[in-house]
Amino acid sequence: MFEAKLANAGLLKKIVESIKDLVTDAPFDCSETAMSLQAMDSSHVALVSLKLEVGLFDTYRCDRTINLGLSLANMSKALKCANNDDTCMLKYEENEGDSIIFTFADPKRDKTQDVTVKMMDIDSEHLGIPDQDYAVVCEMPAGEFQKTCKDLSTFSDSLNITATKAGIVFTGKGDIGSSVVTYSPSSNTDDETEAVTLEVKDPVNVNFSIKYMNQFTKATALSDRVRLSLCNDVPVVVEYPIEENGYLRFYLAPKIDDDENMD
């Protein structure tokens, strides 16, 4: 049996809305310690990695490790039935068929609503993500990163990122013109959520598809902060922490010689 209860359905809504345009079918792995997901996008260019630890849930029970295959479009439809501040219970019993039950409860109205969603058989390939020692780790306000990607996509299909100890520079350059956004590390800020921090072992200069970066920034709703882990010639990691008990990470391979084909 698997049963997990979130205090706010809104959190699960935000997670699903962040990834449903990248990943169609989601193989959720549920264990005693966490509910997690790892999946490539349909073009096999980007990898999505989600982890929701037990501490994120009000109650959590998983008798044995199981895989729950769900269409994210169908999951989104189910979650649209919930108010953001409803509680959300996910329940699956192996002897009761191939469906998962979402129960939304509104304590203010003494109301509950059950939505049953059919599960799917999904071939989930666990991709080994090698441990990487990154040359640059940058943490910044998630809203700033989202705006930067959106602004630069007006000028270019590619996002160039360069970073040194002096700062991190985002550049979009195209036929109609260009835009450059520079962030220096914040030396003193009263609000930690607004700080830009940089750890630089070696300088980096890398190019990525800005279309994918704009997709990733849909996760801005989940977190005030975003972490970019960068190294020349290896995939970038764009990470959004989920409260203090989980994360949503996106991995994207760099573009080679500004070529659109990133496979």
From Swiss-Prot:
| DNA-binding region(s), residue ranges | 61-80
Name of the encoding gene: pcn-1
Q: What is its main location?
A: nucleus
**What taxonomic classification does the UniProt entry list for its organism?**
Eukaryota, Metazoa, Ecdysozoa, Nematoda, Chromadorea
Q: Where in the cell is it found?
A: Nucleus
* Pfam family of the protein (one): PCNA_C
What this protein is reported to do is described as: This protein is an auxiliary protein of DNA polymerase delta and is involved in the control of eukaryotic DNA replication by increasing the polymerase's processibility during elongation of the leading strand.
Q: Which organism is it from?
A: Caenorhabditis elegans
For this record, an example GO cellular component is:
PCNA complex
Hydrolase: present as a keyword of the record?
Answer: no
Q: What is this protein called?
A: Proliferating cell nuclear antigen
HAMAP family attached to this UniProt entry? DNApol_clamp_arch
